[in-house]
């Protein structure tokens, strides 16, 4: 089967046998491991980042299940918010709130409901194909009444504690979406941009040529200037430059004015407070404004030390103006455009107006300087529009009141990577502000606060039942908790007035942050289930969720219960393309996970995501990464299983009938390695180091395939069911069974296919393998590791001189660094001889008899020191006697007499030492040994090499004919006399290497023509 057939077959098998459900039911009564699914939005297609997140979530859940825990996995859908509204606006070809109102809010809401599940089937199919086991039949949905009712209960509880309030503040605002954003939403949308900063001239009233220099990075705010701020504690100067006098901070004078100025007077900031000035523009007139005030937020780290204040677009500006009782003005509308009062720019988007503002300043003579500067600026995380800071009324949750508790809760959380706790996430908590919870939009959980039209009294119902109790008329039985339906419900106020619901819906992050409670409709039902499922043992999402879901979970839980909602967090890195760039459709470098699954299989995709680098690191990812995962790991384990199953079928091996305790050294070694790997992997996975575990497994798969199975082939090929063959079958059966259990969380399809064929039931209802300490033989593993290293080194020597392994060589000389290594290698000399195809492996104490040592002057180091003598020294070094070479190697220094009679001392760094094998010997220098391979070829060695190449040619031809591996055949050869002579002399070797009856020299019809070491011959197999 190819991967697509296998995975399709396994999915059907799991469904038919209820394997996912059984894996949970089998753990009933066991300790619970609590898993939370961060809800995706189903109005967009899944991307590579989703594949990473879902793979790691599935991995952890499978591993913990196999480790004995019951892991409930409830899926979820995030259904509210701006992304849905924007998608619907596109579908309807409308834009903005005015168009929505014209279209009809109720109709718009119905369209939103339809939109949120447009790609639900694609998400389900993707989830299924990826092998992510999560309960998608009973997911929580943030749009459902029970979910919203639980969210209302949390909000009402917060309101009861006076932590939910209405205020007028400067908040981040998206002019495209026409709504404010919370600080954690803002943190997700920063981009590096180039903008213009301006130093403007504010003329002091009643002074002909005296100006205060005010600096701003937002020139578009200058038409709404109300005040200038100085720091009363700072020193300022009045500096004459040309015919004009400028006021600027003393410490910034050189930076702002350059050197061509004269200080007329030094003044304190306090002295400047109260000075009246003329604003650069005269579009607005103020009753109380356009004078200098003192503010401690003004610094001398940049600008002029004097800050222009526009209370509508800066939090510090707003607070300072409010504190002084100065006029509040706003000349920008809700769409981010200048109002008519700014006549030259009316209707123009303010962020596009900086150049026009600067031109107007220059024309009026009030521009001192303009500069380009690069900085990070917040953009809407949903529509990509540059945000404005905008003074408006809104609803806020006083998260600052529970800041310390949130910080304490965070300290109890185990973060992966650890630095996130006190770094990125901890810093965000340190700088948190009250949560701007209200959104002036349509599709979302309605904020459940009713306000009296007359006395401003507020009521917040905890439930639908309370909503009915408060309402002044009957509430429909099927009331839907969305706009515009709940907006029709009014309350009677004690003062005699009417209470209407405030117009806002809530931040969608509060929706998803409430999921620990709302997914089970807490506190209205499922108390026992909720108590078992809170807090989470782990939450897993991308690193950007430090300012998203991770934050909202912690904030909501701390506000509502005082407790942390999770014990540990796995914060995943980004998926990048092979060049290290972020993937995006617009760049054309995005990879579709569904297409990767179709091309390479889900197991290959999963292995590539899990084994390449730690989950919290950014990953460079490409088709090649997935292709290599398939070829190096998935295909290798399948080939090992195919080898086992083919010969087990031929020999009718039955583990229950034929199993034996007998073992060869090779069997003991692979079982020792298996248990060492089980130990390593278990330790890694218990520490959530999934990648380290994968690397241990990958190494073992290679050892199993390229060492154990390859070295054991003759045992499986032997006739009959002897004890040695039983031992090989028994060992490989055990290794494959436990290896597939180890690999099941990584590659669930292949692992289950193999395990089910071996054991009769799914690997996913089995236990993760336990280490058998008694099976671990550290000395045997160390000895065999030495053997493998020697073989690898010797093979590299063959490659250097282009001599194939089929060509036997006379000798491999090994010079080990220590006696223990030599002892281990000597025990397996015959294995090394077979693998390297040498007649003899010999051990020496040193390399003196096999190496030539060459020395030459190190010109970059010795040249400057020797000067004109460098030429003489070069000749001397290159002609050192063996005694001189030995003396230098021992002492690390040598005195050299030059031709002119002078003497120089050469140190270790002055001479380059190169060691080479003597002619006919190839040198390999490893960390623990030196190898010397005799590459001289005698005629007898060449003849044997010819025979081995002949054997390879016959094996290749057998495969082409698709002959059963166990079928014995007769071989007919038609070649020259010399070839026939050689083949006859090595008849025993040919019979050892092939399953044949005989080799006969005769011409047959339709013989296959092959070339063996430049000799042409015809082959026929019958």
Curated annotation (Swiss-Prot):
Query: In terms of one coarse class, where is the protein primarily found?
Result: cytoplasm
Q: What class of enzyme is it?
A: ligase
Where in this protein would one find the motif 'HIGH' region, according to its record? 40-50
Provide one Gene Ontology biological process annotation. Answer: isoleucyl-tRNA aminoacylation
**Reactions accelerated catalytically:** tRNA(Ile) + L-isoleucine + ATP = L-isoleucyl-tRNA(Ile) + AMP + diphosphate
The record's SUPFAM superfamilies line, in alphabetical order, gives: Anticodon-binding domain of a subclass of class I aminoacyl-tRNA synthetases (SSF47323), Nucleotidylyl transferase (SSF52374), ValRS/IleRS/LeuRS editing domain (SSF50677)
Q: Which UniProt keywords apply?
A: Aminoacyl-tRNA synthetase, ATP-binding, Cytoplasm, Ligase, Metal-binding, Nucleotide-binding, Protein biosynthesis, Zinc
Is Protein biosynthesis tagged as a keyword? yes
Q: Name one Pfam family in it.
A: tRNA-synt_1
Q: Which cofactor does it need?
A: Zn(2+)
> What terms describe the molecular function in GO for this protein?
aminoacyl-tRNA deacylase activity; ATP binding; isoleucine-tRNA ligase activity; tRNA binding; zinc ion binding
Choose one Gene Ontology CC annotation of this protein and give it. Answer: cytoplasm
UniProt-listed PANTHER family: ISOLEUCINE--TRNA LIGASE, CYTOPLASMIC (PTHR42780:SF1), SOLEUCYL-TRNA SYNTHETASE (PTHR42780)
What HAMAP family does the annotation carry? Ile_tRNA_synth_type2
Q: What does this protein do?
A: Catalyzes the attachment of isoleucine to tRNA(Ile). As IleRS can inadvertently accommodate and process structurally similar amino acids such as valine, to avoid such errors it has two additional distinct tRNA(Ile)-dependent editing activities. One activity is designated as 'pretransfer' editing and involves the hydrolysis of activated Val-AMP. The other activity is designated 'posttransfer' editing and involves deacylation of mischarged Val-tRNA(Ile).
Please report the name of this protein according to its UniProt entry.
Answer: Isoleucine--tRNA ligase 2
According to its UniProt entry, this protein's organism is Oceanobacillus iheyensis (strain DSM 14371 / CIP 107618 / JCM 11309 / KCTC 3954 / HTE831)
Organism lineage? Bacteria, Bacillati, Bacillota, Bacilli, Bacillales
């Amino acid at each position: 089967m190819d991967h697509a057939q296998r995975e399709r077959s396994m999915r059907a098998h799991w469904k038919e046998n209820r394997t996912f459900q059984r894996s949970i039911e089998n753990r009933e009564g066991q300790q619970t491991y609590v898993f939370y699914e961060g809800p995706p939005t189903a109005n967009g297609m899944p991307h590579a980042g989703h594949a990473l997140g879902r793979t790691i979530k599935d991995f952890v859940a499978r591993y913990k299940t196999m480790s004995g825990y019951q892991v409930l996995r409830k899926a979820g859908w995030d259904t509210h918010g701006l992304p849905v509204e924007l998608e619907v606006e596109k579908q309807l070809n409308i834009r903005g709130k005015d168009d929505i109102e014209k279209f009809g809010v109720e109709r718009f809401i119905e369209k939103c409901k339809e939109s949120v599940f447009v790609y639900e089937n694609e998400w389900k199919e993707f989830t299924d194909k990826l092998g992510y086991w999560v309960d998608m039949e009973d997911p929580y949905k943030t749009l459902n009444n029970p979910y919203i009712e639980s969210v209302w209960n949390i909000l009402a509880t917060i309101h009861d504690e006076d932590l939910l309030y209405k205020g007028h503040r400067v908040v981040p605002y998206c002019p495209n979406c026409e709504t404010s954003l919370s600080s954690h939403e803002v943190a997700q949308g920063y981009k590096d941009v180039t903008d213009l900063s301006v130093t403007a001239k504010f003329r002091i009233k009643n002074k002909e040529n005296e100006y205060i220099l005010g600096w701003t990075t937002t020139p578009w705010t200058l038409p709404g200037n109300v005040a200038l701020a100085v720091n009363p504690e700072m020193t300022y100067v009045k500096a004459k430059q040309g015919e004009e006098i400028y006021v600027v901070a003393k410490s910034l004078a050189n930076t702002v004015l350059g050197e061509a100025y004269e200080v007329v007077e030094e003044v304190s900031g306090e002295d400047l407070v109260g000075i009246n000035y003329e604003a650069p523009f005269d579009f607005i007139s103020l009753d109380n404004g356009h004078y200098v005030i003192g503010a401690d937020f003004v610094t001398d780290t940049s600008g002029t030390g004097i800050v222009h204040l526009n209370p509508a677009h800066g939090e510090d500006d707003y607070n300072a103006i409010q504190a002084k009782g100065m006029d509040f003005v706003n000349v920008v509308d809700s769409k981010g455009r200048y109002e008519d009062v700014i006549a030259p720019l009316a209707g123009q988007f303010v962020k596009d107006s900086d150049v026009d503002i600067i031109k107007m300043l220059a024309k009026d003579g009030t521009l001192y300087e303009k500069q380009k500067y690069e900085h990070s600026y917040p953009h809407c995380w949903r529509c990509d529009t540059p945000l404005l800071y905008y003074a408006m009324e809104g609803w806020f949750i006083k998260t600052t009141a529970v800041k310390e508790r949130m910080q304490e809760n965070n300290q109890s959380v185990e973060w992966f990577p650890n630095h996130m706790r006190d770094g990125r996430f901890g810093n965000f908590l340190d700088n948190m502000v009250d949560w701007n919870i209200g959104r002036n939009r349509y599709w979302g959980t309605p904020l459940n606060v009713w306000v009296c039209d007359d006395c401003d009294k507020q009521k917040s119902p905890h439930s639908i039942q309370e909503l009915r109790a408060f309402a002044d008329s009957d509430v429909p039985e099927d009331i839907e908790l969305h706009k515009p339906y709940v907006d029709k419900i009014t309350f009677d106020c004690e003062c005699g007035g009417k209470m209407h619901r405030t117009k806002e819906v809530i931040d969608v992050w509060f929706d998803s942050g409430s999921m620990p409670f709302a997914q089970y409709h807490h506190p209205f039902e499922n108390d026992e289930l909720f108590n078992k499922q809170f807090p989470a043992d782990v939450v897993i999402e991308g690193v950007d969720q430090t300012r998203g879901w991770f934050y909202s979970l912690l904030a909501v839980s701390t506000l509502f219960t005082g407790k942390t909602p999770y014990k540990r967090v796995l914060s995943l890195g980004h998926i990048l393309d092979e060049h290290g760039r972020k993937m995006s459709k617009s760049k054309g470098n995005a990879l579709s996970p569904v297409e990767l699954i179709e091309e390479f299989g889900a197991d290959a995709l999963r292995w590539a995501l899990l084994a390449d680098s730690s989950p919290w690191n950014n990953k460079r990812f490409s088709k090649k990464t997935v292709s290599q995962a398939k070829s190096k790991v998935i295909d290798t384990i399948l080939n090992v299983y195919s080898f086992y199953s083919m010969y087990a079928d031929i020999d009718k091996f039955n583990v229950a009938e034929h199993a034996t305790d007998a073992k060869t050294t090779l069997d003991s070694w692979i079982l020792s390695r298996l248990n060492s790997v089980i130990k390593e992997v278990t330790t890694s996975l218990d520490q959530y180091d999934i990648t380290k575990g994968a690397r241990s497994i990958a190494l073992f798969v290679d050892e199993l395939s390229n060492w154990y199975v390859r070295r054991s082939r003759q045992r499986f090929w032997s006739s009959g069911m002897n004890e040695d063959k039983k031992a090989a079958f028994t060992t490989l059966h055990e290794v494959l069974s436990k290896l597939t259990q180890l690999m099941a969380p990584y590659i669930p399809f292949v692992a289950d296919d193999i395990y089910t064929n071996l054991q009769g039931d799914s690997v996913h209802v089995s236990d993760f393998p336990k280490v058998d300490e008694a099976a671990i033989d550290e000395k045997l593993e160390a000895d065999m590791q030495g053997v493998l290293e020697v073989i690898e080194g010797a093979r590299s020597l063959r490659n250097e001189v282009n001599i194939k392994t089929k060509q036997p060589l006379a000798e491999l000389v090994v010079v080990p660094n220590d006696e223990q290594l030599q002892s281990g290698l000597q025990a397996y000399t015959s294995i090394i001889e077979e693998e390297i195809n040498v007649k003899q492996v010999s051990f020496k104490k040193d390399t003196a008899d096999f190496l030539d040592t060459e020395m030459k002057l190190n010109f970059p180091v010795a040249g400057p020191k020797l000067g004109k003598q460098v030429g003489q020294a070069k000749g001397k070094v290159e002609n050192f006697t063996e005694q001189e070479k030995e003396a230098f190697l021992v002492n690390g220094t040598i005195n050299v007499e030059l031709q002119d009679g002078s003497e120089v001392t050469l140190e270790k760094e002055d001479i380059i030492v190169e060691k080479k094998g003597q002619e006919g010997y190839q040198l390999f220098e490893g960390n623990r040994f030196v190898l010397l391979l005799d590459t001289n070829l005698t005629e007898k060695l060449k003849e044997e090499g010819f025979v081995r190449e002949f054997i390879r040619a016959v094996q290749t031809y057998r495969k082409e004919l698709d002959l059963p591996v166990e079928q014995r055949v007769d071989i007919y050869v038609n070649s020259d006399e010399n070839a026939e002579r050689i083949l006859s002399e090595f008849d025993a070797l040919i019979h050892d290497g092939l399953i044949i009856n005989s080799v006969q020299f005769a011409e047959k019809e339709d013989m296959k023509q092959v070339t063996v070491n430049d000799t042409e011959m015809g082959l026929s197999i019958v």
